[in-house]
Amino acid sequence: MRSDEVKKGFDRTPHRSLLRATGLKDEDFDKPFIGVANSFIELIPGHFFLDKVSAIIKEEIRANGCVPFEFNTIGVDDGIAMGHDGMLFSLPSRELIANSIETVMNAHKLDAMIAIPNCDKIVPGMIMGALRVNVPTIFVSGGPMQKGYTKDGTPIDLATAFEAVGKFEAGDISEEQLKDIECNACPSGGSCSGMFTANSMNTLMEAMGIALPGNGTILALTPQREVLYRQAARRICEIAKDKASREKYKLKNILNENAVKNAFAVDMAMGGSSNTVLHMLAISKEAGVNFELKDINAISKRVSHIAKISPSLSTVHMEDINKAGGVNAVMKEMTKRGNDILADNLTISGETVLEKIKDAYIKDTNIIHTIDNPYSQVGGLAILYGNLAEQGAVIKTAGITGSRVFTGTAVCFDGQPEAIKGIVSGKVKAGNVVVIRYEGPKGGPGMQEMLAPTSLIMGMGLGSSVALITDGRFSGATRGASIGHVSPEAAEGGMIGLLKDGDEIHIDVDQYILSVNLSDEEIAKRKADFKPLKKPLNSSWLGQYRALVTNASSGAVLKTDL
């Protein structure tokens, strides 16, 4: 066992002495050591109960002949960090989480791991760190939140709360209605109830085979969720106690190229958050998989969009997907379009993908559509290219309700705060393309989410007549014609930084085009005169991050070959 490096032999006497101080006995030194990577934090609705989850998992690990060691990562709640400079720290926290997993697991030579994420950057951060360690790992998330209801019985969620601010600003709802939404949008613990970033990633872990079935959809704080926690604990012990299994189920043997492609395929079928693109590119790099942004459109063309979930369809939430058959039912239906839609990859459960889904079926075709009645014949995400995004940009096509072709005039803002002021003051009109720049990984730094501006646009009734492009990113709760991750970003001299108010911008989602109607001569002239804005910083960590981070087309990973 890997842990023998710290617990076997006379020269490890001091190591065992330290471990005995934590409560270990003689017999424990012959058992596998299991890391329990928790992300308990009282600030986050999806994480404040994870101390109880880890207690259940550790109890089950002990009962199955292994020794659990719990440690914790940090966590940032994107909703609470939204709309102020706290959001600068959200994406960088992914790297800190990955580094902390790698550090603890390797410093103490643990044999296997159960990771307990749930929200936002914590899920991809844990996956990235676990890939560096490459021991058998099962991810078991806290679980999704219940949807809320207003006093009149309308289903709501966090996206409703953000959009309600714009409606209140526009005079469309009263302060009493705003308060009703505030008090009922998030009624329980769990990851926010729609197909936002957290639940998108928790779902994709099922698709990749690194989490057990139900991980993305079984509600938090329910007896069914506890069953899942205990199943995961028993399974990791089965693997850790067997030498051949410890080798067979190393994380990189599960999370390989086929797993990445399966994840993107399920992402397309379910219309996941655009943040999944950023995170899956980063995960691919850690897995040693050669997968690039340009490969995503090829998958999208082969996968039908068969499940719409909030924010794309405000009445449907993760609990509804669970009742309709869950992720396995979606995956089973996907295979009816072609035998090669999903690769029959090994999963951490011991079954292959096709074995795992063989008995799954759709229980409610109003929630999960059949392959013969899709929302769209192509997937719910697209990558756009053109002179405005030479290295690509991302749009969640599942969130578009109006035309998929848009031409409008630019209204430019150097940062999210300036954009929010401009939108609220009425500077943005129908027919405009809102340009928010210097919010990329380097420019922010930290690549803020633009949920506040997009929610204001939707809430003020401009959602079908205004588009938004940014080198920043979007919350999974964003909907509408919102294009993010524009690369190269403004801070590295990208075309988005050269735009001026009044420039004509053309968007054609079905042709994968994002361009500005300028001559080559005009573009060359602007480039010659251009000096990117560099924002002042008073944060040591963000300064380090800005110096090391790559752009969104590479997953915003940190450079390591300095």
Curated annotation (Swiss-Prot):
Keywords tagged on the record: 2Fe-2S, Amino-acid biosynthesis, Branched-chain amino acid biosynthesis, Iron, Iron-sulfur, Lyase, Magnesium, Metal-binding
EC number(s) from the headed UniProt entry: 4.2.1.9
InterPro entries (UniProt xref): Dihydro-acid_dehy_C, DihydroxyA_deHydtase, DiOHA_6PGluconate_deHydtase_CS, ILV_EDD_C, ILV_EDD_N, IlvD/EDD_N
Modified residue annotations for N6-carboxylysine: 121
Pathway: Amino-acid biosynthesis; L-isoleucine biosynthesis; L-isoleucine from 2-oxobutanoate: step 3/4; Amino-acid biosynthesis; L-valine biosynthesis; L-valine from pyruvate: step 3/4
UniProt cofactor(s): [2Fe-2S] cluster; Mg(2+)
Catalytic activity: (2R)-2,3-dihydroxy-3-methylbutanoate = 3-methyl-2-oxobutanoate + H2O; (2R,3R)-2,3-dihydroxy-3-methylpentanoate = (S)-3-methyl-2-oxopentanoate + H2O
PROSITE patterns: ILVD_EDD_1 (PS00886), ILVD_EDD_2 (PS00887)
Residues annotated as the enzyme's active site: 475 (proton acceptor)
Entries under Gene3D superfamilies matching the protein: IlvD/EDD C-terminal domain-like
Complexes and interactors: Homodimer.
Name of the protein: Dihydroxy-acid dehydratase
Organism whose genome encodes this protein: Aliarcobacter butzleri (strain RM4018)
